[in-house]
A protein has these predicted regions:
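Structural recognition of the beta-strand scaffold that forms the well-ordered cores
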Residues: 12-17, 57-61, 146-150, 190-193, ...
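Aromatic-lined carbohydrate-recognition surfaces of secreted/lumenal glycan-active proteins
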Residues: 56-70, 174, 178-202
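Glycan-recognition surfaces
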Residues: 102-103, 123-124, 184-299
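Active-site and adjacent substrate-binding regions of carbohydrate-active enzymes
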Residues: 130-183, 193-196, 253, 259-284
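Carbohydrate-binding surface patches
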Residues: 279-281, 285-288, 293-295, 330-370, ...
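Solvent-exposed beta-hairpin/edge-strand motifs
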Residues: 366-382
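C-terminal beta-strand-rich structural cap/linker in extracellular carbohydrate-active enzymes
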Residues: 387-409
Length: 409
C-alpha cells in the first residue's frame, strides 16, 4: 500500500513505533531480532523487503535498553567481550517511588512487572560502551537506515512532565550515551532523538543526531493535539511545547541554527475534523522542514491520501526550502505567518488560522516581504492568482493558504 500510494511522491521509509515489551527474541549479544515475538521475520528481512520496493526501514528502539531475557541468561555476552550483559546494569537498585510490586533493578518502567520491564545500561560499568555501540552497529548490519530512540528524558533524570517516575542518571551520563551512539552511527544510520528535555536550548542533544522531537505524542490525533492543547504555554522539561504547532514555532530558528530537523511526531489525517485541518497540518510540517510521518493505515485513511500527495508542496521538501515564522512567540499572531525563500528568489508565504472562527488576513507585500508586487500561485488550489501588491483572504477555521510569490522588479 505504501509503495503504491506514497513512494511515487517521494516517501522513502517505513518505521516501526511503540511498545517493545512483548519482544524477547534476542541474539547471543542480547539484541532484539524483531519488533515483536509474533513476527515471523527479522529486521534484515524487512529492510531488504522494503529496499526492493524503493523504501528503507526505520526501527524504534533505545540502545540503552536491556531485555529481561538477556539479564536472565548468564551466557548472553556483550559483543566482543566475555562480559555477561546482566553485569552492565544495576540489578540491586530499588526505586522508592511508584513501584507497588517492588521490582528490583534499574528499570525503564516499573508498572509493567518483573518479566517485562526493560533495564537501563549503567554507563560506568565495563562493557556498557561496547553494548550500546554494538547495538547501533547491529542495526546498521541489519540494513536499518533510521533509529528512533525514545524516552530520553526518562533516562536523563527520571522525570516525566515534572513528575519523578524513575532513576536520575544525570545529564553527564546522558550526554555520554548520546556521544557513544553518535560515534557508532557515523554516517551509516540516521539518529532521531525522542522525548528529550532539550535543556538549555538543547545543549546536550544538538549535534548528537539528525532529528529531535519538539512536542508530545500525537496520541489520539485531531486538532487539539496538533494545535490547541496548552496553547501559549511553555515548560522547562519534556515536552517544552505540547503540540506540533507550538513546537514548530518555538524551535524553528533554534533547530535551524544547529542544522537539526524538528520532529513533530506522526500525522493521522483520519482523526482531523475536515480537509482544512488536514491541509494545515501537512502544510506546516512541510514548510518547517519536519518529516511527514504518515500514521494513517490503509483501512483508516479513507479518502485523504491526496492531502499527502500535493506535489507542489512536496517539492519544497525536495528542494530543502525552510520557512520561518515572523515571530517565535506562540502568543503573537505573527507566529502564524511563515516565510521561506527558494534559491531562485521565489518566496513561499504561508498563513494559518489556529482559531475555531473564520479569520481575516491581509498582508502587504512591501511591508512584510520587502517587495512591491509579485505574481502569486496558490499551492493547494494549483492556480495562478495573478499579480498582487498584497494578499487578502478570509481563512476558514483551522485553515491555511500556501502561496508562491515570484517578485516583479
Amino acid at each position: 500500500w505504501v509503495a503504491k500510494e506514497f513512494v511515487p511522491y517521494g516517501y522513502e521509509m517505513v518505521c516501526t513505533d511503540g511498545w517493545i515489551e512483548d519482544s524477547f527474541c534476542i541474539n547471543e549479544n542480547g539484541y532484539l531480532t524483531r519488533h515483536h515475538d509474533s513476527w515471523k521475520h527479522d529486521w534484515k528481512y524487512w529492510a531488504d523487503y522494503l529496499n526492493e520496493r524503493g523504501m528503507a526501514l526505520g526501527v524504534y528502539y533505545n540502545p540503552t535498553w536491556i531485555s529481561p531475557a538477556a539479564v536472565k541468561n548468564k551466557e548472553i555476552l556483550v559483543k566482543g567481550t566475555n562480559i555477561p550483559v546482566r553485569e552492565i546494569t544495576d540489578l540491586s537498585y530499588v526505586y522508592n517511588g511508584e513501584n507497588e510490586k517492588k521490582i528490583t533493578g534499574d528499570r525503564f518502567s516499573y508498572p509493567n512487572g518483573e518479566d517485562r520491564a526493560l533495564y537501563w545500561v549503567d554507563v560506568d560499568r565495563s562493557g556498557a560502551k561496547e553494548y550500546v555501540q554494538g547495538y547501533v552497529k547491529y542495526f546498521i548490519d541489519c540494513h536499518v537506515a533510521f533509529l528512533r530512540i525514545d524516552f530520553l528524558s526518562w533516562y536523563e533524570d527520571g522525570m516525566d512532565k515534572g513528575k519523578q517516575i524513575g532513576r536520575n542518571h544525570g545529564s553527564a551520563n546522558y550526554r555520554k550515551v548520546l556521544e557513544w551512539i553518535k560515534e557508532a552511527a557515523g554516517d551509516q544510520i540516521m539518529i532521531s532523538l525522542v522525548m528529550p528535555h532539550l535543556k538549555n536550548n538543547g545543549e546536550n542533544e544538538f549535534g548528537m543526531g539528525q532529528m529531535a522531537r519538539i512536542n508530545e505524542d500525537s496520541g489520539t490525533g485531531g486538532w487539539d493535539t496538533f494545535s490547541d492543547r496548552n496553547r501559549g504555554l511553555h515548560f522547562d522539561y519534556w515536552s517544552q511545547c505540547t503540540t506540533a504547532f507550538e513546537g514548530l514555532i518555538y524551535w524553528s530558528k533554534i533547530f535551524a541554527d544547529h542544522n537539526m530537523i524538528m520532529d513533530a511526531d506522526m500525522l493521522r489525517l483520519n482523526t482531523f475534523a475536515n480537509d482544512e485541518e488536514c491541509k494545515s497540518a501537512v502544510s506546516l510540517e512541510l514548510i518547517a522542514g519536519a518529516p511527514l510521518d504518515i500514521a494513517d493505515q490503509y483501512d483508516t485513511i479513507k479518502d485523504r491520501a491526496w492531502i499527502y500527495q500535493n506535489e507542489e508542496l512536496l517539492a519544497l521538501n525536495k528542494k530543502e526550502i525552510l520557512s520561518f515564522p515572523l515571530s517565535t512567540d506562540t502568543k503573537n499572531p505573527d507566529s502564524t505567518i511563515w516565510i521561506g525563500k527558494e534559491a531562485t528568489g521565489e518566496i513561499i508565504l504561508s498563513v494559518f488560522n489556529r482559531d475555531a472562527e473564520e479569520k481575516e488576513v491581509e498582508i502587504d507585500f512591501k511591508q512584510v516581504l520587502l517587495c512591491r508586487a509579485a505574481s502569486v500561485r496558490d499551492l493547494w488550489m494549483h492556480e495562478d492568482l495573478g499579480e498582487m501588491k498584497s494578499f487578502h483572504t478570509m481563512l476558514p477555521p483551522h485553515g491555511c493558504r500556501v502561496l508562491k510569490l515570484s517578485e516583479r522588479s
